[in-house]
């Protein structure tokens, strides 16, 4: 943690940083972990997280807020600005949360009618809100899928919990796949690269799963849930029902994203060197 760009007095001790008589300050928080890929033990073969964090913190020494913000906006907009959508919606005069409340109807009665027996009115569409949702989905993917080998998970980057629901894992019986539905269709092919690397890690572990669970000596499989370590075996919490726990088509569904990349790019080298070996 570094505190700088302040008009107050800063002191530091074992308890932390203290700012006195200041009206403003810029605080840089730098974090790192020992995660070093799914095949490496984070303790015995982990990344040098202290050195990495210290190096990142050192690079903030001669950087002010405006420079950091400018670099962020430039990096983000090179992807975001590729696609524009105009459905003819007008800029609203209310905040987004107020706009949402005005557009989302209350749950209707079971018969779909009002108290006087009349059909419930159909809510009108809002072209601005639909455009906003479209670009919001692209924003989420750009922000969540930039780390090599680590695709966007169930909660993205914004979970407020130390232990997130479903551990912020990868649910591969639709959630992980739908995270990446906007990638090629909205010109964000780079965001799929972490998913490609993750599928390759799944394929390595999936060879053991398909052999030990199903007695098959070729190919690979992945079940419904995975994590940072690219696990592929059947898992679950509490009641591990076979209805979902033993579903083993996660790998088959995920490799469809590899084929989609080829359909969009027609990159035969990618098809030959990466996609087909994982699909066969």
Positions of PLM-derived features:
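Residue-level recognition of tetratricopeptide repeat
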Residues: 138, 260-263
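Extracellular structured ligand-interaction cores
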Residues: 22-26, 136, 176-177, 244, ...
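Acidic/polar, glycine-enriched structural segments that form the non-catalytic walls/loops
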Residues: 1-170, 188-211
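Helix-terminus loop motifs that line ligand-binding clefts
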Residues: 145-174, 181-256, 262, 269-274, ...
């Amino acid at each position: 943690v570094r505190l700088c760009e302040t008009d107050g007095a800063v002191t530091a001790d074992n308890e932390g940083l203290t700012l006195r008589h200041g009206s403003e300050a810029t605080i840089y928080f730098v974090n790192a972990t020992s995660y070093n890929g799914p095949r490496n033990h984070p303790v015995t073969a982990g990344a040098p997280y202290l050195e990495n964090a210290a190096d990142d913190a050192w690079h903030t020494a001669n950087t002010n807020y405006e420079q950091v913000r400018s670099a962020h906006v430039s990096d983000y907009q090179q992807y975001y600005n590729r696609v524009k959508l105009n459905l003819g919606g007008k800029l609203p005069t209310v905040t987004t949360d107020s706009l949402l409340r005005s557009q989302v109807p209350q749950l209707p009665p079971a018969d779909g009618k009002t108290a006087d027996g009349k059909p419930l009115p159909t809510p009108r569409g809002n072209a601005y809100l639909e455009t906003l949702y479209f670009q919001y989905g692209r924003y989420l993917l750009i922000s969540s899928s930039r780390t090599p080998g680590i695709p966007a998970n169930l909660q993205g980057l914004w979970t407020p919990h130390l232990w997130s629901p479903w551990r912020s894992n990868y649910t591969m019986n639709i959630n992980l796949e739908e995270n990446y539905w906007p990638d090629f269709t909205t010109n964000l092919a780079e965001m799929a690269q972490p998913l490609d690397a993750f599928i390759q890690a799944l394929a390595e572990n999936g060879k053991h799963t398909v052999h030990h669970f199903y007695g098959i000596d070729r190919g690979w499989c992945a079940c419904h849930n995975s994590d940072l370590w690219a696990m592929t075996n059947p898992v679950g919490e509490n009641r591990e029902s076979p209805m979902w726990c033993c579903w083993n088509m996660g790998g088959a569904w995920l490799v469809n994203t590899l084929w989609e990349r080829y359909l969009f790019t027609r990159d035969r080298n990618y098809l030959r060197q990466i996609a087909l070996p994982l699909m066969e």
